[in-house]
A protein has these predicted regions:
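Conserved coupling/switch loops of ABC nucleotide-binding domains, chiefly the family-specific signature
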Residues: 69-72, 226, 258
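Conserved ABC transporter NBD signature motif
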Residues: 71-79
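Helix-to-loop junction immediately C-terminal to a conserved catalytic motif
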Residues: 63
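The feature captures the beta-strand-to-loop junction immediately N-terminal to the Walker
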Residues: 48-50
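ABC ATPase nucleotide-binding domains
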Residues: 85-91, 95, 99-246
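Non-catalytic connector elements of ABC transporters
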Residues: 254, 264-389
Length: 389
C-alpha cells in the first residue's frame, strides 16, 4: 500500500545531498573540476550564476541526465553515480514545463505514479487520491479536466510542479522554472513555490540566473562562476558579506573603488579617491596591515550630501525619482562613476551638475584584497570553506 508520509505528519522527503570532488568534461573541455558541496535535507538550495557557469550541468549530474567524469554523489549514504535516473526517486521541473499536450491536467499529474516499475505500482484508487492531494495543494483541482492548451503559463507550471511532487520524490530539482513567465507572474509563482516547499519539506535544488528570485526563495545559495562555487550561504550572508568581488557585483549592484589601507591606532583607515579617508572597525585582525584594497559599496551604502565637509567629491550626472527612493548617477572628480540610492527627500531633488560629496556607510560596505579574491572583514560566513575543511 502507498505510504503517504506527509499525511502522517512526518518531515517528508528530507534527503541530504553530498557531492565530493565532482568533475564534468565535454570532450577535452573541463566545465566542472573538483567541486564539493553539501545540501541539507529539507532545505531550499539554489544554484545561482551567469549563463554558462555550470549550474544546470551540476543539476543534471544530480539528476543522472549528465555523465560524471569524477567524484562522488550521495543521497544520504547512498552513492548514486551509477544509479539509473528512474531509480533516484527525483522530481524534475523544467524551464519549458514539459507537460504532455495530449493529456488533461489530472492524467499529467498521475503520469509518474502510473508508470512506476512493476514492483512499486499502486492501486488506481490510491493514485487518484494522491493526485487529488497535489492538485489541491497547487490550487489547480478545478482545472483537472482541462487540456494544457487551455491553461496559462502559470497554471502549466503548477501542473508540472504537482506532477513532480505527486510521486513523493526524495529530491525536487527545478531548472529555471519561472524564466518563461512574465514579471508579475514570476513573483506570484516564486512565492507559491516557496510556500509549497515549506509545507512538503522536500530537499529542493533550484537553478536560476535571477538574483532577486534566488534571494526570495532560498534557504541557502551557492554562487557559481566558471564551474567553480564562489560562496555558499544564506541570502543575508551573501548580500551583506560576499566572499569576493564577483559575488559582490553579481548579487545586487555595487560601486567598486580602489584604495590604500593603513593602520592607525589599531584600526584600518582606507584612503579613497579625491582624498577621502574612511575608518573601518570590522577588518579581521589578521588582515590589519598596510595594503592596497578594493572597496565595494552598494548604492544604498553611499550617502549624497551637499555643502562643505568630508566625503568623496562628485558631480551629479543624472537622477531618477522612483517614489520612495531617488537614484543618483554621479562621477567622482577622480573620474570613477557611481550609483547611489537614497530615500527621496520631501524637498527638491539634487539637480544634475551639482557638486556633492559622498559619505560611506563603513558598517555595511565591504573591503577586499586588491585582486578582489577575498573579503578582509569579519563576519564573512562561507559554508563552502567549512565543507572543504
Amino acid at each position: 500500500m502507498f505510504y503517504d508520509r506527509a499525511s502522517k505528519g512526518e518531515i517528508a522527503m528530507s534527503v541530504n545531498i553530498n557531492i565530493r570532488n565532482a568533475v564534468k568534461r565535454y570532450g577535452n573541455t573541463t566545465v566542472i573540476e573538483n567541486l564539493t558541496l553539501s545540501i541539507r535535507g529539507g532545505e531550499f538550495f539554489t544554484l545561482l550564476g551567469p549563463s554558462g557557469c555550470g549550474k544546470t550541468t551540476l543539476l543534471r549530474m544530480i539528476a543522472g541526465f549528465n555523465s560524471i567524469e569524477g567524484g562522488d554523489f550521495y543521497f544520504n549514504d547512498t552513492r548514486i553515480n551509477d544509479l539509473n535516473p528512474a531509480k533516484r526517486n527525483i522530481g524534475m521541473v523544467f524551464q519549458n514545463y514539459a507537460i504532455f499536450p495530449h493529456m488533461n491536467v489530472r492524467k499529467n499529474v498521475e503520469f509518474g505514479l502510473k508508470n512506476r516499475p512493476a514492483d512499486k505500482r499502486i492501486d488506481k484508487k490510491l493514485i487518484h487520491g494522491q493526485a487529488d492531494k497535489f492538485l489541491k495543494l497547487m490550487q489547480i483541482d478545478q482545472l483537472a479536466d482541462r487540456m494544457p492548451a487551455q491553461l496559462s503559463g502559470g497554471q502549466q507550471q503548477r501542473v508540472a510542479l504537482a506532477r513532480a511532487l505527486c510521486i513523493e520524490p526524495d529530491v525536487l530539482l527545478m531548472d529555471e522554472p519561472l524564466s518563461n513567465l512574465d514579471a508579475k507572474l514570476r513573483v506570484e509563482m516564486r512565492t507559491a513555490i516557496k510556500e509549497i516547499q515549506n509545507s512538503v519539506g522536500i530537499t529542493t535544488v533550484y537553478v536560476t540566473h535571477d538574483q532577486e528570485e534566488a534571494m526570495a526563495v532560498s534557504d541557502r545559495i551557492a554562487v557559481m562562476n566558471g564551474g567553480v562555487i564562489q560562496h555558499v550561504g544564506t541570502p543575508k550572508n551573501i548580500y551583506q558579506r560576499p566572499a569576493n568581488t564577483f559575488v559582490a557585483t553579481f548579487i545586487g549592484r555595487s560601486n567598486i573603488l580602489k584604495g590604500e589601507m593603513e593602520v592607525e591606532g589599531g584600526k584600518a583607515v582606507v584612503s579613497l579617491p579625491t582624498g577621502y579617508k574612511a575608518a573601518f572597525d570590522t577588518v579581521a585582525p589578521e588582515n590589519l596591515k598596510k595594503q592596497p584594497v578594493t572597496l565595494c559599496a552598494r548604492p544604498e551604502e553611499l550617502i549624497v550630501e551637499t555643502g562643505e565637509g568630508e566625503g568623496l567629491k562628485a558631480v551629479i550626472d543624472s537622477c531618477v525619482f522612483l517614489g520612495l527612493n531617488t537614484h543618483y548617477f554621479v562621477h567622482l572628480l577622480s573620474g570613477e562613476k557611481a550609483e547611489i540610492i537614497q530615500e527621496s527627500s520631501i524637498d527638491s531633488i539634487i539637480k544634475p551638475g551639482t557638486q556633492v560629496r559622498l559619505r560611506l556607510n563603513t558598517e555595511k560596505a565591504n573591503l577586499f584584497t586588491q585582486d578582489g579574491s577575498r573579503n578582509l572583514l569579519t563576519g564573512v560566513e562561507n559554508d563552502l570553506v567549512k565543507e572543504a575543511v
